[in-house]
């Protein structure tokens, strides 16, 4: 898949965002339902002097799952120990992390849907009973010993909650889904980031960046950096509406936040498959892309914005897709 400026997946350049991430729920912009619930859950756990229930955070990439995990650790007054599903290859890898936890710490596992079954089996007693089962020795002489673990909170993140096994999913007391952000919330995020980056920006400039950011803070901050560069070279350095518009047009990010790959997907669905229904495998083959890329990277935003419907028979283009390409929507079928 081509490198996408508006991809929600983290890139090396996005590591800069860590310096401008909010560090408390009070500074956390957007996701009002999640924020209110976590304020209550964290406040109650702190009041009882207990570890927060294990928490699963899921949603499309770039919406702030890692940021929320960091905030949870800070609000609970514990240390954050981070890892990811693909990194935990051996039982010893997870055992080492668990035995190094202190009371109240938060263990963050990103991409938890990629854990192996062996690692999951170790997690079950650790999550339920704060115990770690370890095998000592090999063969007939092998024996199992139990180690007590301090009360801790497992915070897990995934873009594909449906791939979690039921036994693992059922062990999370708190499950939060992050939704795409509104233009209003993203405008506040862009303004806040610009202020921290010492970039002069108008409300209209911030709103234009927000409108084309696909409801995703990571993309908004990435576009802001590129617009800043454009304004510095082509203007006075201030990001106003005109500067943002010209910069984003140059970057092939249109007013709807769609890029070349989005338009190619919609064009393929409309023209090659007559608007659908089309199976994801057929679409992926026609685009020479992986079906997982379509499902995880391209389709979530297009579906959320009403360009595509996902049905049992396949993907169907909506009237909005036809209008986006200046085409006349088909007459409804009787």
Curated annotation (Swiss-Prot):
Binding site for ATP: 20-21, 62, 65-67, 128-130, 171, 181, 218
Record's GO cellular component terms: cytoplasm; Holliday junction resolvase complex
Stretches the record annotates as Large ATPase domain (RuvB-L): 1-181
Pfam family membership, one: AAA_lid_4
Binding site for DNA: 310, 315
Record-linked InterPro entries: AAA+_ATPase (IPR003593), AAA_lid_4 (IPR041445), DNA_helicase_Holl-junc_RuvB (IPR004605), P-loop_NTPase (IPR027417), RuvB-like_N (IPR008824), RuvB_C (IPR008823), WH-like_DNA-bd_sf (IPR036388), WH_DNA-bd_sf (IPR036390)
Presence of keyword DNA damage: yes
Domain of life of the organism encoding this protein: Bacteria
Top enzyme category: hydrolase
GO biological process, one term: DNA recombination
Reaction catalyzed: ATP + H2O = ADP + phosphate + H(+)
Region of interest called Small ATPAse domain (RuvB-S), as start-end residue ranges on this chain: 182-252
Cellular compartments annotated: Cytoplasm
Chain positions covered by the region annotation Head domain (RuvB-H): 255-334
UniProt binding sites for Mg(2+): 66
Molecular function GO terms recorded: ATP binding; ATP hydrolysis activity; four-way junction DNA binding; four-way junction helicase activity
SUBUNIT field: Homohexamer. Forms an RuvA(8)-RuvB(12)-Holliday junction (HJ) complex. HJ DNA is sandwiched between 2 RuvA tetramers; dsDNA enters through RuvA and exits via RuvB. An RuvB hexamer assembles on each DNA strand where it exits the tetramer. Each RuvB hexamer is contacted by two RuvA subunits (via domain III) on 2 adjacent RuvB subunits; this complex drives branch migration. In the full resolvosome a probable DNA-RuvA(4)-RuvB(12)-RuvC(2) complex forms which resolves the HJ.
Free-text note regarding domains: Has 3 domains, the large (RuvB-L) and small ATPase (RuvB-S) domains and the C-terminal head (RuvB-H) domain. The head domain binds DNA, while the ATPase domains jointly bind ATP, ADP or are empty depending on the state of the subunit in the translocation cycle. During a single DNA translocation step the structure of each domain remains the same, but their relative positions change.
Summary of the function given for this chain in its UniProt record: The RuvA-RuvB-RuvC complex processes Holliday junction (HJ) DNA during genetic recombination and DNA repair, while the RuvA-RuvB complex plays an important role in the rescue of blocked DNA replication forks via replication fork reversal (RFR). RuvA specifically binds to HJ cruciform DNA, conferring on it an open structure. The RuvB hexamer acts as an ATP-dependent pump, pulling dsDNA into and through the RuvAB complex. RuvB forms 2 homohexamers on either side of HJ DNA bound by 1 or 2 RuvA tetramers; 4 subunits per hexamer contact DNA at a time.
Protein family per UniProt: Belongs to the RuvB family.
Protein name as it appears in the record: Holliday junction branch migration complex subunit RuvB
């Amino acid at each position: 898949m081509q490198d996408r400026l508006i991809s929600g997946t983290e890139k090396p350049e996005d590591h800069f965002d860590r310096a401008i991430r909010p560090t408390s729920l009070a500074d956390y912009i957007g996701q009002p339902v999640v924020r209110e619930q976590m304020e209550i859950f964290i406040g109650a756990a702190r009041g009882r002097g207990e570890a927060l229930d294990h928490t699963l955070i899921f949603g499309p990439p770039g919406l702030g799952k890692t940021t929320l995990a960091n905030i949870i650790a800070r609000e609970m007054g514990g240390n954050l120990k981070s890892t990811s599903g693909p990194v935990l290859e051996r039982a010893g890898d997870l055992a080492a992390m668990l035995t190094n936890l202190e009371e109240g710490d938060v263990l963050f596992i990103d991409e938890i849907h990629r854990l192996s079954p062996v690692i999951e089996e170790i997690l079950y007693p650790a999550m339920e009973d704060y115990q770690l089962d370890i095998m000592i020795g090999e063969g007939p002489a092998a024996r199992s010993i139990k180690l007590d673990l301090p009360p801790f909170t497992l915070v897990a993140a995934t873009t594909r909650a449906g791939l979690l096994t039921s036994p693992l999913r059922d062990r999370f007391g708190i499950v939060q889904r992050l939704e795409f952000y509104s233009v209003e919330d993203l405008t506040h995020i862009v303004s806040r980031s610009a202020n921290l980056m010492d970039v002069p920006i108008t409300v209209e400039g911030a709103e234009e960046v927000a409108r084309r950011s696909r409801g995703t803070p990571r993309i908004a901050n990435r576009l802001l950096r590129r617009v800043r560069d454009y304004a510095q070279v082509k203007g006075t350095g201030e990001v106003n509406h005109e500067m943002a518009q010209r910069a984003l047009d140059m970057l092939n990010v249109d007013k709807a936040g769609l890029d070349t790959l989005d338009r190619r997907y919609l064009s393929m669905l409309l023209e090659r498959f007559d608007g659908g229904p089309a199976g994801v495998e057929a679409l992926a083959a026609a685009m020479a892309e992986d079906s997982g890329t379509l499902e995880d990277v391209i389709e979530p935003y297009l579906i959320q914005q009403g360009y595509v419907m996902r049905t049992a028979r396949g993907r169907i283009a909506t009237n909005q897709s036809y209008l986006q390409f200046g085409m006349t929507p088909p007459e409804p079928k009787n």
